[in-house]
Amino acid sequence: MIGAGLAGSEAAWQLAEAGIDVVLHEMRPDRMTEAHRTATPAELVCSNSFRSDDAANNAVGLLHAEMRRLGSLIMRAADANQVPAGGALAVDRDSFAAAVATALQGHPRIELRRGEITGLPPAEWANVIIATGPLTSQPLADAIRALTDESALAFFDAIAPIVHKDTIDMSKAWFQSRYDKVGPGGTGADYINCPMTREQYDAFVAALLAGEKTDFKDWETNTPYFDGCLPIEVMAERGHETLRHGPMKPVGLTNPHDPTVKPYAIVQLRQDNKLGTLYNMVGFQTKLKYGPQQQIFRTIPGLENAEFARLGGLHRNTFLNSPKLLDQQLRLRAQPRLRFAGQMTGCEGYVESASIGLIAGLYAAAEARGASLAAPPPTTALGALLGHITGGHIETIDGATRSFQPMNINFGLFPPLAAAPTKKPDGTRLKGNEKTVAKKQAMSARALADLDRWIAEHLRVAAAA
């Protein structure tokens, strides 16, 4: 087990609890990262929040509940060290990390070994989990890249906002591919298009330039932008018309709502998951702060009431093109003895990273016993996130840059309900936002029921094997 962050600590715990001896390697304090300040396992380097703990109405709260049912060390330590934060689960970061460290060091099956792993693990290491996070040391990152290919690791996260499709106003927007081009897997109407007049475009560019931006972290400042990853506000700074000759170009598209008027600019959204519930804003990676992002992007015609599954961002990161490189059990296709977990697999957030460490640990434990473990159902938060990592992205329609990007858990990753709720328990019809609330609650209830069934049918059977 390489890396004692959230994912690595959780994976080691799951393995040990399953009766498997684990050597947990951590390079700190011998080699520190630009962000860590201690050598303690599971140090929280940014926020102290695990976000919403509402399992009935929030996808990350649901993930909390699922992890608790699976005996998560990270959730146990978080619950024991929480601080007041309204409906969120926030923790005292030092006592949280200390609790994780105490549990790991006190487990008879876990050996915590300090020192940097500077290359691929030796061949005799037959069952390895690599969970070294977004700040993986350069020697190990180079070794992984050499084993895969040059484009397998991204060193600058270009994140465009992702919108829930059912919140886009299709009386203003429309489906069409540029020049009606039919690409691989496409239909010729694969993008959602939002038109702008000249006045709307002028106001939009002015808002981008004036919007408050997030500063780079100290360790990010020397990382260059890559071609194709420029923040949208940086493009706007290069010239007033730059965007309408770039990601907002209006050519090859006709607005069926007003076919005689040529839009001055067009914002395109591209399907982001196989289910078709999420669409990303093409070319809209940004360093705008979250508040200004929502305010500015909701001025786009058709997105006035948009709900965002994820807001945009641009920060240094190290993550794998997991759908290409990893199999369904998080093993590297090129060398299946190596399994990956945590943020480097393409999940965002503390809880998400720990949850992928949890499932990686369960997979590795089953493998160590000569057994196999079925994946958790895609209707669960754990299964939905795993599905995104190992294959939930789609190939780009026009051969553009791959669409796989790190993602927080959200209900857009889940399969739709067979039938959405329409009535309250008292029989009266649901109205407006009540429908959204009822839908989320139904998805959460389905997830926990399916997880309990999976635990009974697969996990206990695997544990007994």
From Swiss-Prot:
GO terms for cellular component: cytosol. Pfam families: GIDA. GO terms for biological process: tRNA methylation; tRNA wobble uridine modification. It is found in: Cytoplasm. Belongs to the MnmG family. TrmFO subfamily. Its EC number is 2.1.1.74. Transmembrane segments: none annotated. The gene is trmFO. SUPFAM superfamilies: FAD/NAD(P)-binding domain (SSF51905). Its cofactor is FAD. FAD binds at G3, A4, G5, L6, A7, G8. InterPro entries: FAD/NAD-bd_sf, MnmG-rel, MnmG-rel_CS, MnmG_N, TrmFO. Gene3D superfamilies: FAD/NAD(P)-binding domain (3.50.50.60). One of its GO terms (molecular function) is tRNA (uracil(54)-C5)-methyltransferase activity, 5,10-methylenetetrahydrofolate-dependent. HAMAP family: TrmFO. It catalyses: uridine(54) in tRNA + (6R)-5,10-methylene-5,6,7,8-tetrahydrofolate + NADH + H(+) = 5-methyluridine(54) in tRNA + (6S)-5,6,7,8-tetrahydrofolate + NAD(+); uridine(54) in tRNA + (6R)-5,10-methylene-5,6,7,8-tetrahydrofolate + NADPH + H(+) = 5-methyluridine(54) in tRNA + (6S)-5,6,7,8-tetrahydrofolate + NADP(+). Coiled coil: none annotated. Catalyzes the folate-dependent formation of 5-methyl-uridine at position 54 (M-5-U54) in all tRNAs. Keywords: Cytoplasm, FAD, Flavoprotein, Methyltransferase, NAD, NADP, Transferase, tRNA processing. This is Methylenetetrahydrofolate--tRNA-(uracil-5-)-methyltransferase TrmFO. It comes from the Bacteria.
